[in-house]
Amino acid sequence: GSICLEPKVVGPCKARIRRFYFDSETGKCTPFIYGGCGGNGNNFETLHACRAICRA
């Protein structure tokens, strides 16, 4: 899906939430720390969800 091509966005908030995003350069789902608000669709709660949607 096109959300998998969106850039990683931490967002403006200061929470430290472990999420996963699809890295289009490596073709892999990669963990990152999400701020808790803002962001975009390339933000998954689990590695499994990221892989399922982005076919990684």
Swiss-Prot record:
Keyword vocabulary terms for this entry: Disulfide bond, Ion channel impairing toxin, Nematocyst, Protease inhibitor, Secreted, Serine protease inhibitor, Toxin
Superkingdom field: Eukaryota
Compartments, as annotated in UniProt: Secreted; Nematocyst
Function: This recombinant serine protease inhibitor inhibits both trypsin (Ki=21 nM) and chymotrypsin (Ki=500 nM). It possesses anti-inflammatory activity in vitro. It inhibits macrophage LPS-induced nitric oxide synthesis, and blocks histamine influence on intracellular calcium concentration in murine bone marrow-derived macrophages, which can indicate inhibition of H1-histamine receptor (HRH1). In vitro, it shows cytoprotective activity in the oxidative stress agent 6-hydroxydopamine (6-OHDA)-induced neurotoxicity model.
GO molecular function: ion channel regulator activity; serine-type endopeptidase inhibitor activity; toxin activity
Protein's name according to its UniProt entry: PI-stichotoxin-Hcr2o
Keyword Cell cycle part of the UniProt annotation: no
Organism: Radianthus crispa (Leathery sea anemone)
Site description Reactive bond for trypsin, residues in chain: K14, A15
Sequence similarity: Belongs to the venom Kunitz-type family. Sea anemone type 2 potassium channel toxin subfamily.
Gene3D superfamilies: Pancreatic trypsin inhibitor Kunitz domain (4.10.410.10)
Matches recorded under PANTHER family: BPTI_KUNITZ INHIBITOR DOMAIN-CONTAINING PROTEIN, KUNITZ-TYPE PROTEASE INHIBITOR-RELATED
